């Protein structure tokens, strides 16, 4: 019996995930995208989702609300929903995991998070990620990756994994700014540790566990994203540091004001506060970032 898989979002990570899952001959993969040319087969999303066993969400965070509205009336009650979306909802500041649990219940929701850069997956480099979900869902979803370059391990903290994805994007942006300022490896080590500490503190504000930060979903993904030439968060940080016009948007930059709004400015910790000041306050980046080292 084949696994009927639908990937929503044919961007970089959606396309890379499709290549990974195709390694398992038991997987039958369909793709839906807002661009009709990228859809396979060419069918409405509502129709495709009604004939799937596993739904993978690989869409930008700003599109998650609209996607849920489209599929929730048509998706099967036994379909598992796995999200790779790393962001925060714009209206009320909900995590992707919070929205999914609210609409579909906790037992069939999973968050796939870890160091799995799309470019490296496409090039055949091995990767490993956390599949944050219930025991039953993990038993059903994990075999999809059998024989592929991506291995998964279970994590019980769904909201923590989702929050880690949001926070690591913001801190990757900050570490990109530090790299653009050419602050050196010592400074990077200091700021990486500070980011880790702040993520652990902030995790409680997102219903997650501080220990989740020290998993593949947290520190593992943060290190990969903050140091890779393929990372949009890193690239955006470099542009901000050098006073260049932002030519593309990244999840870290988009999520930052939403996280600030959810937490409140008084609860901002030093590194996140510095990133907010530099990215959106247009303050002197070198002066502010060097202040973090004292």
Language-model segments: residues:
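Rossmann-like NAD(P)(H) cofactor-binding subdomain of soluble oxidoreductases
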Residues: 17-18, 45-125, 141-143
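NAD(P)-dependent Rossmann-like dehydrogenase/reductase catalytic/cofactor-binding core
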Residues: 2, 175, 204-294
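NAD(P)+-binding Rossmann beta1-loop-alpha1 motif at the extreme N-terminus of oxidoreductases
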Residues: 1-54
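Internal alpha-helical scaffold of NAD(P)-dependent oxidoreductase catalytic cores
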Residues: 74, 99-107, 126-212
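Conserved active-site and cofactor/substrate-binding residues in soluble primary-metabolism enzymes
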Residues: 8, 12, 16, 62, ...
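General beta-strand structural signal in soluble alpha/beta enzymes
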Residues: 83, 108-113, 152-156, 215, ...
């Amino acid at each position: 019996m084949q696994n009927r898989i639908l990937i929503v979002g044919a961007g970089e990570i959606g396309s890379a995930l499709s290549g990974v899952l195709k390694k398992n001959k038991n997987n039958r993969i369909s793709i839906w995208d807002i661009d009709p040319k990228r859809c396979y087969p060419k069918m409405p999303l509502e129709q495709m989702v009604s004939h799937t066993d596993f739904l993978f969400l690989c869409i930008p965070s700003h599109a998650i609300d609209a996607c849920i509205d489209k599929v929730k009336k048509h998706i099967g009650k036994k379909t598992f929903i796995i999200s790779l979306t790393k962001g925060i909802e714009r209206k009320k500041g909900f995590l992707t995991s919070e929205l999914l649990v609210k609409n579909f219940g906790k037992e069939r929701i999973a968050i796939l998070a870890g160091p799995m850069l799309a470019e490296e997956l496409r090039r055949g480099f091995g990767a490993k990620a956390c599949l944050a979900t219930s025991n039953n869902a993990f038993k059903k979803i994990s075999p999809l990756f059998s024989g592929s370059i991506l291995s998964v391990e279970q994590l019980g903290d769904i909201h923590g994994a989702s929050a880690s994805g949001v926070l690591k994007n913001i801190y990757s942006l900050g570490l990109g700014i530090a790299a653009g300022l050419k602050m050196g490896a010592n400074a990077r080590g200091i700021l990486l540790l500070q980011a880790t500490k702040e993520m652990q503190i902030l995790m409680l504000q997102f219903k997650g566990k501080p220990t989740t930060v020290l998993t593949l979903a947290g520190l593992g993904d943060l290190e990969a994203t903050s140091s890779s030439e393929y990372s949009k968060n890193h690239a955006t940080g470099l542009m901000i540091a050098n006073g260049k016009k932002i030519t593309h948007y990244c999840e870290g930059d988009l999520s930052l004001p939403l996280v600030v709004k959810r937490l409140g400015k008084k609860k901002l910790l030093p590194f996140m506060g510095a990133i907010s000041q530099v990215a959106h306050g247009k303050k002197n980046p070198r002066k502010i970032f060097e202040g973090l080292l004292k």
